[in-house]
Amino acid sequence: VGVGTWTKIGLNNTDYNDQGAFDAVNNHFVAPVDGTYLFGATLLYKINASATARMRGRLVLNGTTEIRGSLGEISATHVSLATAIWLQTMVPLTAGDTVELQGYFRVADGYFAADHTSFWGCKVG
């Protein structure tokens, strides 16, 4: 992922998708019904060329609006395959709303480790 641009993170594996709410083609969660949903994510840093990268993550509603409480950043020195961000928030959704995971790097580019970056959501109310 390059520097200075929020990028939707493609997820390579679906561990649980019993209700079919995760759209793997478009890499986002689609609310099946109206309600309150709990979302979370883990982003694991993987070095490209420099450990000076500063990693951010967030959850985004319908491709444009950052969900309140979902933004996180690690601003200390990063260690490849050890530095991680954990995000968690709740949000009211209408059936058909989408939620996606986005990542961002400051200072230097980097990767989000595919085998340990995760995104999840469930209806709680």
Where on the chain are the PLM-derived regions?
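Extracellular jelly-roll beta-sandwich "head" domains, especially the C-terminal globular C1q domain
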Residues: 1-125
